[in-house]
Amino acid sequence: MIRFFSFLLFTLFLFSCKQKTEIVQAEMKSFNMKFDLRLYSDSTYIFKSIYEFDSIKNETLKGKYKLVNDTLVCYGDFNFNGFIKNNFIESNDEYEKYEILNSKINSNSKIDFQKFPTYTIFTFSKSKGYNYFESTAISYELTENDLLTIDSILPICMNKTSYFKGVKNTNNYSKQCVATKNKNGEIEVWVNCACSGIAKDSYKYFIGAVYDGGHCFFRLKINLTKKECFDVVVNGY
């Protein structure tokens, strides 16, 4: 009897060891779409495309992944190369990322975005689109103090145009930031702004092109070192 129970316990132990567990769940939202990425302990992933009003387009992709430190590569149907940073899984190829909802792994988060709910940051790369910087620019990692500085400079920059007279803060705008250092070692940040009501479901996840919409969409550059703004562009003007 003792041998039987010992064998049973050993069998249950082996069975439990073979059961894969979810270690990361991340998602990207885009208007009426959602992309759900889940990583499992056996180095497999499941990637789902979910369409709210057109379920026939829903798709599930599966494959293997490799995670080394903060670098993530997915193989198979969902081909992805990126890294984990500030509670997001960010692409190396495009200005897009997935927000981590649940995780059993440690990741490097230098910014608490609960303090900055209207901001999101994308890592600069010359190979990505929307490259508004000089050819000598290199990537710079923004800090919480940098975001505070940007937040204080933005209203000043906006009030220099006729479209934003009297603006005291930018709380009603969602801000996407891409930061670099120029050849002089100065920190330059491209800031893409959109009315929060319009962009709330997408601004955290990807940078998209918008060519109209008036003052609900504008962008500019800020030299954090000199605390100056330039290249202000307001859609439709």
Short names for language-model regions:
Residues I46-K48, K110-T180:
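N-terminal secretory signal peptides
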Residues S91-N108, G213-Y237:
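C-terminal partner/receptor-binding element of secreted or periplasmic proteins
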Residues S16-K62, K66-V68, V73-K110:
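Lipid interaction determinants
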Residues S49-Y51, N69-T71, G76-N79, C193-G197, ...:
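A mature extracytoplasmic/lumenal domain signature
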Residues Y40-D42, K64-T71, T180-I187, K221-E228:
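A short, structured loop/turn motif at beta-sheet edges
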Residues F4-F15:
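Sec-dependent N-terminal signal peptides
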Residues M158-F217, K221:
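Functional cores of ribonucleases/endoribonucleases
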